[in-house]
């Protein structure tokens, strides 16, 4: 489901564009599973589910996942020289814990088209030259599954899951039980990435060479991961998801496109690009006190 409202106006040397949008989606999931034993006749053609006498590991799982987004954006330019854009995005994810479901993610961009300045003299070398810069935040749900917000209770038989169950009674019979399968973290929140971009676009030599240079620096915080350390295995429950750690990605990308003609009937183009990327784990997160 999506709704969008836009407004555009040009007055003199000014250009204004406004947009508001809402999107919503829902995903429903249901899973039923069971194993049947105790068939009087073990011929394959007779081993229907209804002919069994002992149900093993019945499971019934149902959940809904909802996502809603609200976006507002405004763009302004003056005389094909100065360009500004600002936006705000508010996202809702039902799979996150109560009080952590919403995330706010702003962004801004600016550009300066130098060749549109009155003082810039037209020439055969530089046809267009533009500087760009932007900053923004985005959120993602990482490895959070659709059913994370659902409290999970499972019935397991040790014959199928050896790590579950207890031996009790005179004959040490292993009894089935109901247990909480996964720990839930009520403080789990959005994984966020904050990125800065600076770029240069140029069209040179009578529009034959297109050149673009981009530098970016991206910091991702509150990484969503399983709590692998400081979680005793004796608890008897799977470790929860947590926000922990920070990653930095920094890089430079250069792309070029050369277009020309040979005579009147033959045209050709050659493109190339080169990029560098440095990835660093700037914060490893919680450390194991035992090393």
Stretches with model-predicted labels:
Residues 1-291:
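Extracellular/periplasmic, surface-exposed regions of secreted and cell-surface proteins
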């Amino acid at each position: 489901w999506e709704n969008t409202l836009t407004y555009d106006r040009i007055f003199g040397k000014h250009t204004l564009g406004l947009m508001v949008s809402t999107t919503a989606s829902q995903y429903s999931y249901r899973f039923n599973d069971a194993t049947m034993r105790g068939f009087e006749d073990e011929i394959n053609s007779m081993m229907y589910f209804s002919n069994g006498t002992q149900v093993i590991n019945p499971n019934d799982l149902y959940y809904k996942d909802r996502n809603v987004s609200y976006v507002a954006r405004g763009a302004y330019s003056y005389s094909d020289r100065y360009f500004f854009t600002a936006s705000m995005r508010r996202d809702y994810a039902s799979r996150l814990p109560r009080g952590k479901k919403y995330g706010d993610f702003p962004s801004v961009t600016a550009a300066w088209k130098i060749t549109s300045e009155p003082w810039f003299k037209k020439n055969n070398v530089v046809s267009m030259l533009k500087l760009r810069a932007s900053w923004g935040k985005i959120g993602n749900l990482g490895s959070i599954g659709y059913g994370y917000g659902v409290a999970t209770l499972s019935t397991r038989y040790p014959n199928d899951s050896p790590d579950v169950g207890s031996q009790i009674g005179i004959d040490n019979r292993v009894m089935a039980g109901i247990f909480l399968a996964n720990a839930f973290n009520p403080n789990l929140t959005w994984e966020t990435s904050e990125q800065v971009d600076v770029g240069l676009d140029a069209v040179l030599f009578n529009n034959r060479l297109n050149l673009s240079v981009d530098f970016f620096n991206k910091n991702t915080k509150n990484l969503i991961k399983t709590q692998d350390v400081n979680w005793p295995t004796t608890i008897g429950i799977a470790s929860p998801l947590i926000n922990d750690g920070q990653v930095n990605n920094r890089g430079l990308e250069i792309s070029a496109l050369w277009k020309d003609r040979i005579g009147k009937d033959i045209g050709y183009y050659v493109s190339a690009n080169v990029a560098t990327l440095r990835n660093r784990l700037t914060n490893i997160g919680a450390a194991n006190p035992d090393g």
